[in-house]
Amino acid sequence: MEHHGENPKKQVFAIIPARYSSVRLPGKMLLPIAGKPLILHTVERAREAATIDEVIVATDDHRIFEAVTAEGHQAVLTSAEHQSGSDRIAEVANSLPKGSIIVNVQGDEPVISPATIDAAVNALLHDPQADMATTCEPIESLLELLNGNNVKVVIGDNGYAVYFSRSPMPWPRDASLRHGGDPNRAIEEQPELLSNFRKHTGLYVYRREYLLKFTQLPQTKLEKFEMLEQLRALENGAKIRVVEAAAKSIGVDTEADLKLVRAILEAEEKAHEIVA
């Protein structure tokens, strides 16, 4: 863990990694939603965050680059060899000013709340001991808890991440014992137990120098076991501040996600037209 002095004049860059290829939803970054490509909605949300000075899309695809720059937004063509979004944004961050704050905004979250971005950025800016910050959301059902695609985060009383896992954590021992050792049954009969769980979301805020260091570290045992990149940071002693998201976001991974996001953004578009 490194100690970082506070500097209220730090520049804050939102970098949005955007690939064209997607196993479940090919070309999703350019799929039309309410009259514009998905990626542009994400860019606009990031630009609305009060803490963000600049928004940059990092992509290895000319189609995404052209769609973004045609609307006057910044984009950078990166290497096609990157294994993760963190590696992609690190390539861009390497040319940004020293001491900058780097926000990794997932490109496939077109309804992300600008207030969530601000909360995460401010959490890092006001905590000189933290290397990075991220966000979490409440878990509202047993189905959501048991879904391995929903990463759970355990947060200590000090507000730092203790562990991330695809498994339900922490374990409700006493409640489980009262229900024959079955935690699922315990939660079904005591849904208030869900308040003990948090879902990790994909927004990350890094100090530039830590991001560059992190992406040079070799993969760790737990990271490879759970296939969770953030465990590499924890295993190497990073302090990760976790804050509650201002609103639930939706990552577009399936046709069902796309349909839901289209309904939300088209409704917002109609509401704006009525006001205008």
Task: Indicate where each model-derived feature is located.
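Short phosphate-binding loop-to-helix
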Residues: 56, 62-122
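Residues that scaffold the ATP/ADP-binding catalytic core of kinase and kinase-like folds
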Residues: 67, 92, 164, 213-214, ...
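A conserved hydrophobic position in a structured secondary element of the catalytic/binding core
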Residues: 59-60, 112, 206, 253
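N-terminal glycine-rich phosphate-binding loop and ensuing alpha1 helix
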Residues: 11-58
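Conserved core of the sugar-phosphate nucleotidyltransferase
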Residues: 113-220
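Short, high-confidence coil segments that cap the C-terminus of an alpha-helix
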Residues: 52, 98-99, 127-130, 238
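Conserved alpha/beta core of the MobA/IspD/sugar-nucleotide pyrophosphorylase nucleotidyltransferase superfamily
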Residues: 181-276
